[in-house]
């Protein structure tokens, strides 16, 4: 078995969609941990065992994803972990860019190529 490219922590507020997205990332060679219900739980898990990158979907409950990312940026232990926001649109995307300007923003279609820069060597 090929070693994983690295660990991704995926946050999506719809459990079945989170599983689908995680499956695609696993097929691309990533080890994936999911949180689909509780941003605070996600933040604590990320702080306890930091991944290479955090992926947050904005397609559902973008304010929850934005607040989780803000927590990660305001906590010393998680401040430097890259955050990738996926599928944001309109006002939700604008608010997120304003609150977390150093994050990467992409679409589901381009996520695998964006994640390549975080591959474990």
Which functions belong to the PLM regions below?
Residues 15-34:
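Two-component/phosphorelay signaling modules centered on CheY-like receiver
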């Amino acid at each position: 078995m090929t070693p994983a490219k690295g660990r991704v922590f995926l946050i999506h507020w719809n459990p079945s969609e989170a599983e689908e997205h995680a499956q695609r990332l696993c097929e691309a060679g990533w080890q994936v941990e999911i949180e689909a219900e509780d941003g605070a739980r996600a933040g604590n898990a990320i702080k306890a065992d930091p991944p290479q990158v955090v992926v947050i979907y904005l397609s559902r409950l973008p304010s929850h994803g934005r607040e989780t990312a803000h927590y990660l940026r305001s906590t010393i232990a998680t401040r430097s972990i890259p955050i990738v926001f996926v599928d944001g649109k309109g006002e939700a995307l604008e608010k997120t860019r304003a609150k977390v300007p150093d994050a990467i923003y992409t679409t589901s279609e381009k996520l695998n190529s964006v994640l390549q820069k975080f591959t474990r060597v």
